[in-house]
Structure formats: structure tokens, C-alpha cells
């Protein structure tokens, strides 16, 4: 159980509670979760964050009415800066997007600007918003994380409780730069405990990390309850703490739920994330 499971900010969320669905625009549906909630137990504060990054959201169920009342659809891509005060709670984001369904907007740019304004206000940070017509993204190939996949190792695992100590002593003597990938990342929603399925890419330069130890560590998230963004920051923090690489990037892409997927990345070096969807997205 996370140390902040009973944080007062969580009690105020609609997540896990019966909810009415509103189809007319309502910015108040958005709900924020303070990033400090999980960062402070890790010793992370705004003036000493060891990373930069963003939470990339893909919006697959976005619709509104044009000035003639004709429904419009688009796919949205949101990038929320990791130094924002808050993250956006995903169920509230879904409810907020549903409120566009029967609302008239003059054009797609008006929708984009509304999203950017409201999300920035809720997160108290920088947000970029792009909206794509379907013919702009139709036919795009399925992407794949570059790197060596950890998942084919012939190892026996019988514990699925989170344990950062798997990384204790995992840093070897050889100095390398490598990208490691696992599709076995699975954690659970902090509130509902519904499963969150993801793939993760870890790129680092420094003492070589034992691949078996790293896979055991990632699998130990299987019963762990945290939001996507928090899991990625925990992975970054634990690898830095135990393995002390010179550079590190952690990027996870999660399967969609409620028409949204969340794809957080954190890095202490130059990094440009791929934004194409993976096979399970």
C-alpha cells in the first residue's frame, strides 16, 4: 500500500464513485492530484527534481458540435509538463471530455484552445494540445520501443509485491549505454485497484544494470497501487538511487482506458519521446 493511500486529496476525487455523465461543457469536472503527494515520500521537491519530462495523453473519444450542430471528431494529443503542480486525474478527464459532446464550438481551434486553457489551469503548469483529423493519422504504423527486451529471460518468479531492493547491488563494473524494454509492467489504479497495463523503455549510461534484477523489480509492481505517472517517477528514482547511472530516461506507454492512454516519461538528459502507439494501444 502506498504511504499516501488515505491522502485527503484522494477522498475528493470522483474516481471509484457513481458519477453522472454531463454532455455539455463543464470545466469544473476536471480534478487535480498534487504531484507532491507521491514525490515527498521519495524525497523529491520542486527545487530538487532530478528529472524533467511530461505526461503524454492520447484522446481517442473527442467530439463536439460545429456551428450547424453537426458532430465533429478528432484525436487529441496532450503533453503536460512534469513540473506542473498537479497531475490530471484520468476519470475526471474523461468526464470533462464527455462534456464537449453536445457543445457547439466555432471550429477545431476553439476546441484546442479550450482544452489548453482548462488543463493548464487544473494542472497549474504548461500544457500543449494538438488535435488531428482522422485522415491525418489513418494508416500510421504500430510503433515499438527500441532496445533489448528483458522479458524472455528464463527465470522463476514467485513474489509480486513491490520491492525496490531487487535493485540493491544490481549495478555492475562494466560501463555501458543501453536501452532496455519490458512489456510486463503492470500496476493498479491507486483508488479502484483496476489493472494498468504498460510497456516501459529504460535508457541509461553508466554501470551496467543486471537484467534479471531489473526485470524482477519491474514485475514487483504487479500488486502495486499507484497512478501511471507516479510509477514512472518511482522507477526513475529507484534506478538512480541504487544504480547511479550518469544519464537515465524512463518512458512508459500504457494501454488505453475510457478512450484515454497515458504515456509518462522522465529523463535527466536530452530526450524526444516517440508518440506512435504501441501494439497494445
From Swiss-Prot:
Stated name of the protein: NADPH-dependent 7-cyano-7-deazaguanine reductase
Organism classification: Bacteria, Pseudomonadati, Pseudomonadota, Gammaproteobacteria, Enterobacterales
One cellular component term from this protein's GO annotations in UniProt: cytoplasm
Native source organism of the sequence: Yersinia pseudotuberculosis serotype O:1b (strain IP 31758)
Gene responsible for this protein: queF
Residues binding substrate, per UniProt: 88-90, 228-229
NCBIfam families: QueF
Residues that, per the record, bind NADPH: 90-91, 257-258
Lineage top rank: taxon: Bacteria
Enzyme class: oxidoreductase
Any one biological process term the GO annotation gives: tRNA modification
Amino acid at each position: 500500500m502506498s504511504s499516501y493511500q488515505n491522502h485527503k486529496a484522494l477522498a475528493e476525487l470522483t474516481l471509484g464513485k457513481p458519477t453522472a455523465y454531463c454532455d455539455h461543457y463543464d470545466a469544473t469536472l476536471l480534478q487535480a492530484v498534487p504531484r507532491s503527494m507521491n514525490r515527498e515520500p521519495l524525497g523529491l521537491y520542486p527545487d530538487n527534481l532530478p528529472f524533467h519530462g511530461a505526461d503524454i495523453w492520447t484522446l481517442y473519444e473527442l467530439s463536439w458540435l460545429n456551428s450547424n450542430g453537426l458532430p465533429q471528431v478528432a484525436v487529441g494529443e496532450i503533453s503536460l509538463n512534469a513540473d506542473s503542480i498537479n497531475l490530471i486525474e484520468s476519470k475526471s478527464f474523461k468526464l470533462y471530455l464527455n462534456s464537449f459532446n453536445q457543445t457547439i464550438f466555432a471550429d477545431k481551434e476553439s476546441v484546442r484552445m479550450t482544452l489548453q486553457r482548462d488543463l493548464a489551469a487544473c494542472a497549474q503548469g504548461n500544457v500543449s494540445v494538438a488535435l488531428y483529423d482522422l485522415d491525418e493519422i489513418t494508416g500510421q504504423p504500430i510503433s515499438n520501443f527500441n532496445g533489448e527486451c528483458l522479458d524472455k529471460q528464463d527465470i522463476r518468479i514467485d513474489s509480486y509485491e513491490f520491492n525496490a531492493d531487487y535493485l540493491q547491488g544490481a549495478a555492475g563494473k562494466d560501463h555501458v549505454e543501453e536501452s532496455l524494454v519490458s512489456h510486463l509492467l503492470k500496476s493498479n489504479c491507486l483508488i479502484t485497484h483496476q489493472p494498468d497495463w504498460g510497456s516501459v523503455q529504460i535508457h541509461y549510461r553508466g554501470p551496467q544494470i543486471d537484467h534479471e534484477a531489473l526485470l524482477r523489480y519491474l514485475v514487483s509492481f504487479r500488486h502495486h497501487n499507484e497512478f501511471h505517472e507516479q510509477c514512472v517517477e518511482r522507477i526513475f528514482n529507484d534506478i538512480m538511487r541504487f544504480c547511479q547511472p550518469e544519464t537515465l530516461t524512463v518512458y512508459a506507454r500504457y494501454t488505453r482506458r475510457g478512450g484515454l492512454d497515458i504515456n509518462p516519461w522522465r529523463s535527466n538528459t536530452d530526450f524526444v519521446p516517440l508518440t506512435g502507439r504501441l501494439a497494445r494501444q
